[in-house]
């Protein structure tokens, strides 16, 4: 069980990190566990919905030192404390336009901060008796047209990852969060307020989105979340080959150790591969792969066409 911290996470004085930190965070026990579950409020979760949520939590767990544990399902999303021995930390529920008082809102993730969460749910007619632990809870608008949970590479999945980011304490780069930390704009980092670099950005809007939708946390999200919770030190340990896919998705390769390879041999056209951490390789206008900061990919295998391959600063084997 995690506890919503009563104090704020300290600013790092590094603007591209503080620009994504709200100040709210979970205090973790020795097992590093944050529990999650599904709750009903007139709309029932499907098996596919559960699978999609599991994939989203798995994507976050792969990059931070947190064990996300699925606890179960409750009939009323506000009542996990009455059903289970321990309350569920992050409860996910489905609502509609009436609940949100809007047809344009897709979802909402509450920061893990008691004062903030209680204030939000009070504005919706709840109180600490009817809804005793709202911190970190996430609600989705089932009536919004983009919220299709059948596709892991959809706008909806991108939004699920975004809302989990809020539940972990990440904020939008254009606002100050709870602690009033810097925005990217105030820090002179407006160029980083981009959905290509962080799930938490609103720019560009979905109506003019030109990238693939994210299937993992993005580079700046990983840096910020690892600052709060630490890094996962087991993901892709050992020698790993990461195959590039022309599947229309935006993803980050996070790899902790070994001698690793970026393999583009199944791509049917020449491309430019970049192995250095923080760099990206674009397969087409939608499919893009970032190399996470502190991830070292030593080797590359190109396509059967004309490629340009940039290595990283260590010893590389580059096969064209």
Task: Tell where the protein language model's regions lie, with residue ranges.
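Disordered inhibitory propeptide/activation segment of secreted metzincin zinc metalloprotease zymogens
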Residues: 1-47, 102-123, 128
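Short pre-active-site segment immediately N-terminal to the catalytic Zn-binding motif
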Residues: 42-50, 141-160
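Zn2+-dependent metallopeptidase catalytic core
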Residues: 44-75, 161, 257
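The catalytic-center signature of Zn2+-dependent metalloproteases
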Residues: 82-88, 94-101, 106-111, 154-217
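Extracellular, beta-strand-rich repeat scaffolds characterized by small/acidic residue-biased motifs
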Residues: 85, 257, 266-268, 277, ...
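Acidic/polar low-complexity surface segments
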Residues: 233, 272-299
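Short beta-strand elements of solenoid repeat domains
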Residues: 263, 292, 299-301, 308-310, ...
């Amino acid at each position: 069980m995690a506890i919503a911290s009563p104090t704020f996470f300290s600013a790092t004085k590094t603007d591209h990190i503080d620009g994504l930190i709200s100040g709210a965070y979970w205090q973790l026990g020795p097992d590093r566990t944050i529990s999650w579950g599904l709750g009903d409020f007139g709309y029932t979760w499907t098996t596919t919905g559960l699978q999609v949520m599991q994939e989203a939590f798995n994507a976050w767990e792969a990059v931070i030192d947190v064990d996300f544990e699925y606890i179960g399902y409750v009939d009323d999303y506000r009542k996990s404390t009455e059903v289970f021995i321990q309350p569920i930390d992050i409860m996910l529920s489905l609502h509609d336009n009436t609940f949100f008082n809007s047809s344009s809102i897709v979802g909402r993730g509450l920061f893990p901060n008691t004062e903030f969460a209680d204030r939000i749910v009070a504005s919706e007619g709840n109180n600490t008796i009817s809804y005793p632990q709202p911190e970190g809870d996430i609600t989705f608008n089932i009536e919004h047209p983009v919220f299709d949970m059948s596709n892991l590479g959809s706008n909806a999945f991108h939004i699920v990852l975004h809302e989990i980011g809020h539940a972990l304490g990440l904020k939008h780069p254009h606002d100050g969060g709870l602690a009033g930390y810097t925005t990217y704009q105030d820090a002179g980092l407006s160029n980083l307020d981009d959905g290509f670099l962080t799930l938490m950005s609103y720019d560009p809007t979905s109506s003019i989105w030109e990238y693939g939708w994210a299937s993992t946390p993005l580079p700046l999200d990983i840096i910020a979340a690892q600052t709060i919770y630490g890094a996962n030190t087991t993901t892709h340990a050992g020698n790993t080959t990461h195959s590039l896919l022309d599947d229309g998705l935006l993803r980050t390769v996070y790899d902790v150790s070994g001698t690793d390879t970026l393999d583009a041999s199944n791509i049917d056209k020449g491309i430019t591969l970049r192995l250095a951490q923080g760099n990206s390789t674009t397969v087409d206008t939608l499919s893009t792969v970032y190399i996470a900061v502190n991830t070292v990919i030593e080797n590359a295998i190109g396509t059967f066409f004309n490629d340009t391959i940039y290595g990283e600063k260590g010893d590389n084997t580059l096969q064209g």
